[in-house]
Every structure is written in structure tokens, then in C-alpha cells.
A protein has these predicted regions:
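Mobile, glycine-enriched helix-loop/loop "lid" segments at the mouths of ligand-binding/catalytic clefts
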Residues: 109-118, 186-190
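Conserved beta-strand->loop/alpha-helix structural units within folded catalytic cores of enzymes
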Residues: 138, 143-144, 156
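Domain-scale signature associated with acetyltransferase and cell-envelope carbohydrate enzymes
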Residues: 1-104, 131-133, 140, 150, ...
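Conserved catalytic-core motifs of eukaryotic protein kinase domains, centered on the activation segment
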Residues: 106-108, 113-114, 146, 180-181
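A short acidic, glycine-rich active-site loop
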Residues: 117-128
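A generic "structured core" feature
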Residues: 135, 151-153, 158-159
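A short, glycine- and basic residue-enriched loop/turn
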Residues: 88, 127-128, 145-146, 161, ...
């Protein structure tokens, strides 16, 4: 990375932290188009994390702007990557473990183009919503058009391809619900 890019990145990170009081971020946080990122208070984002917004691809501007929203009390361990061309919303008091990848769009896959890079991004598939109090385990991948319901747990190594109801435990590739919380018995019950 050349010196101009390093300086620009430091200034961008400084301004981002200044505009979001109560935000702790490691100096290695990478931002792309931070004007599309909003954060609540009392948030910690660990080292080597990336919040990347895309408002165009291959020189074509999208009709809508991307949006990453991180609510208050969120804790992110390290190595989180969010790729956003639509909308990613993370609710209050969410815990995200290491090496999590969240993406809200699909890449085109037509073999009729010269190469896959020339395919347009499909941003109409739907965003990602992680509701309040969710716990995301290590090495989880969250794909577009899903909602992870309030106080749910996603087990380590899971790939979330469809929505997960509130107060559930989901694991696997693809992730599937294995438990739900029974409020009458006050325990987790296997499905």
C-alpha cells in the first residue's frame, strides 16, 4: 500500500470514529464507502474487520444505496467481513465471534460472459437482518435474504442460507434449527 493510501485510510478511520461516539475499533478496520455505514453507541469491532459497501459495480451505479447499520452494544471479536450492496442490519447487543462473513448480494453466474467478473451483481435478492441479542459463532457465513431472529444462536461453522426464527439454535451447512427456547419450562428444547 503506498503512502497516500495509508494516509487516506488513517484519515477515513479517524473521521469514522469521530462521527460515531462510543465506538471502539481496532486500527486495522477497513472501510469502503463509510458514508453508508451507521453505528449506535457502545460498540467494539475487533482487529482485521472489514465493513465494505458497494454502490456500483463495473462502472454501473446501483439504483439504491447500500446500508450497513450496527445498533448499540454490539461486540465483534475479529476478522468480520461485511460485503453490502443492499442492506445489512445488526441489532442491539449482538455478539459476533471471529472470522464471520456476511454478504447481502449474489454475484452473477452466467457462463455466457467472457468471465464471471463481467456478470452483474444481483442486489435484489434481499438484505440481511440480525435481530437483537443474537450470538453468531466462529466461522459463520451469512448469505443474502435472511433474518436471524431475536436471541437466536448460530453455531460455529454454520452457513445461513435461510431465515432462523427467534429464540432458536441453528447449526450446520446449510444451517438448520436444532433447538428452540421453551418459555414455560425456561429451557432449550431439542427439535
Amino acid at each position: 500500500m503506498d503512502i497516500k493510501k495509508k494516509i487516506r485510510r488513517k484519515i477515513e478511520l479517524y473521521n469514522f470514529k469521530r462521527n460515531h461516539r462510543g465506538l471502539y475499533v481496532d486500527g486495522s478496520l477497513q472501510l469502503r464507502l463509510p458514508k453508508y455505514i451507521s453505528c449506535g453507541s457502545n460498540i467494539a469491532i475487533g482487529e482485521n474487520s472489514k465493513l465494505l459497501c458497494w454502490d456500483s459495480y463495473n462502472g454501473k451505479k446501483f439504483e439504491t444505496s447500500p446500508s450497513i447499520i450496527i445498533e448499540s452494544g454490539v461486540r465483534i471479536t475479529r476478522n468480520l467481513t461485511i460485503q453490502c450492496a443492499n442492506r445489512v442490519q445488526i441489532g442491539d447487543n449482538v455478539l459476533i465471534a471471529s472470522d464471520v462473513f456476511i454478504i447481502d448480494y449474489n454475484h452473477g453466474n452466467s457462463p455466457l460472459t467472457k468471465n464471471y467478473r463481467d456478470n452483474p451483481l444481483n442486489i435484489s435478492v434481499g438484505g440481511v437482518t440480525i435481530e437483537n441479542g443474537v450470538w453468531i459463532g466462529n466461522n459463520v457465513i451469512i448469505l443474502p435474504n435472511v433474518t436471524i431472529g431475536e436471541k437466536s444462536i448460530v453455531g460455529a461453522g454454520s452457513v445461513v442460507t435461510k431465515s432462523i426464527p427467534a429464540y432458536s439454535v441453528a447449526v450446520g451447512n446449510p444451517a438448520h434449527v436444532i433447538k428452540h427456547f421453551d418459555f414455560e419450562a425456561n429451557i432449550w428444547i431439542e427439535d
